[in-house]
A protein has these predicted regions:
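Membrane-interface loop-to-helix entry segments
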Residues: 133-191, 242-247, 366-376, 395, ...
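Membrane-interface "cap" regions at the ends of multi-pass membrane proteins
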Residues: 1-53, 65-70, 81-82, 191-192, ...
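TM-loop-TM module centered on a large, flexible mid-protein loop between adjacent transmembrane helices
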Residues: 87-88, 94, 126, 241-305, ...
Length: 451
């Protein structure tokens, strides 16, 4: 075969991604990634932490995420092929700040499959109590690992079908909840406002503590920024789609938890906090116990599998760049083309961690890292579009500053144990990075390599 000529005409033969994704397509993709049932799994933990007030917490979290989404969308215009908080912060602020952001992302990637395993084990135990919860934890940790070792993954069509099925379940829950509420009339108008504000249990500490957990509902919206090369008018549509996704998920999530709190008030304890939404739904129509429970189990199963392989690929990228020992983390199984060592490594961490962490504490650790990354992106957008820009526009000042300080307040509202555990993780990572880069003088990569 002859050599490829290096002429300008040959360049036209290089395949490029077609820009076919409209604004609506991008928002739909974002909703699929975040899942229409996003707040249901965490409803019990949110209600317990906020003593109710879950609706208000989700709406406040939405305000923080909308500001952060604007920053993500704007940074995607500057770095259209990156889509990573690590890249934004490292390039705009300092490589050491980028490392801190990247290390917080590593914790997120590891904790995500862990909390999915914990939740799946709890729900499976509700369906089959003959096997203890610890047995289900072992089962799901092993199954996630074995399936990922085989390179099994769902197709885009299956994911879209699952999103449609979840949406149908959400509609069914709304119908049953409305029927139940109308069948149990309340003359007290406070009944309908209590999910927003209950004077008997409201404190700012409870509200912001709940809001710091509610951030989980929105984690993943930044995935839209990875579609810049396939989107029509990406400079406009990526930011609009990111903001639109947060808005759609926020309003939908608020509606979902609102009807749940009307049906099952915060003053009434749940039989199982982790599967609280399933019990609230079943109160409106008994078959929903199985319908909602199975839907959430499948959703968390898929999320757990995807999160584990995502974590394994991140560690592979770090191993390939020698940020981690290449001999272990930088290898790929030649048969199934997966980072085998990393999949097993994450599987072991998930299995052990599931016996020491609760679902609620896992959410806090996940948000500990996510909020650091969000603050980093807001800071990067502020530096690029305001500090370094000759034109000091308020539109380039308000969103990143607002997003940064709301995220900071939410991060500070995490529980003390979560902040201690997260800080230990960050301290170990910073010490490792300082040693590995000889005082942050050499680059380290936290980019997830393409499949």
């Amino acid at each position: 075969m002859g050599a490829i000529p290096t002429t300008s005409s040959a360049a036209t033969l290089v395949p490029r991604l077609r820009r076919t994704l409209t604004l609506r397509d991008l928002i739909l993709y974002g909703v699929i990634v975040l899942q229409p049932v996003a707040p249901m799994s965490a409803f019990g933990a949110l209600s317990d932490r906020g003593r109710g007030h879950v609706v208000t917490a989700i709406l406040i979290a939405m305000l923080a995420m909308l500001s952060t989404a604007i920053s993500y969308g704007r940074m995607a215009q500057v770095y259209p092929s990156a889509g990573s908080a690590f890249t934004y912060v490292a390039q705009e602020i300092h490589p050491s700040a980028g490392y801190i952001t990247g290390w917080s992302m590593v914790m997120d990637y590891i904790v995500n499959p862990l909390i999915c395993t914990i939740w799946c084990a709890g729900q499976a135990h509700e369906f089959a109590p003959g096997l203890p919860v610890w047995g289900w934890k072992v089962f799901f940790a092993v199954v996630f690992t074995l399936l990922n070792l085989q390179g099994i993954k769902t197709s885009a069509r299956v994911n879209a079908g699952m999103a449609a099925a979840m949406s149908a379940v959400v509609v069914l829950v709304f119908v049953c909840a409305i029927r139940y509420i109308l069948g149990h009339p309340h003359n007290d108008f406070g009944f309908f406002t209590r999910p927003f504000y209950d004077p008997q249990t409201f404190t700012l500490g409870n509200l912001f503590g709940c809001t710091s957990l509610a951030v989980l509902t929105y984690i993943g919206f930044d995935a839209i920024s990875t579609l810049s090369e396939e989107a029509e008018n990406p400079k406009r549509n990526i930011m609009l789609a990111t903001v639109g996704t947060c808005l759609v998920i926020g309003l939908l999530s608020a509606a979902e938890v609102y009807v749940a709190q009307l049906v099952w008030p915060a003053s009434r304890p749940f039989p199982n906090q982790d599967t609280a939404y399933v019990y609230a739904a079943a109160l409106t129509w008994a078959p929903l116990f199985k319908i909602v429970g199975l839907t959430l189990l499948i959703a968390n199963f898929g999320s757990g599998m995807g999160a584990q392989i995502g974590a394994a690929r991140l560690l592979y990228g770090m191993g390939r760049s020698n940020a981690l020992p290449r001999s272990f983390f930088g290898k790929v199984d030649p048969k199934n083309h997966v980072p085998r060592n990393n999949v097993i490594f994450i599987g072991v961490i998930v299995l052990i961690g599931s016996f020491f962490l609760t679902f609620g504490r896992g959410i806090e650790l996940l948000n500990f890292g996510a909020l650091i990354a969000f603050m980093g992106v807001n800071a990067a957008a502020f530096v690029h579009y305001f500090v370094r820009s000759p034109q000091k526009k308020l539109t380039n000042f308000i969103p990143p500053v607002l997003g940064f300080f709301i995220c900071l307040a939410l991060w500070w509202s995490l529980s003390v144990p979560a902040k201690i555990l997260g800080s230990i993780w960050m301290a170990l990572g910073i010490a490792f990075g300082y040693w590995k880069t000889h005082g942050f003088r050499e680059p380290l990569s936290f980019e997830v390599p393409a499949e």
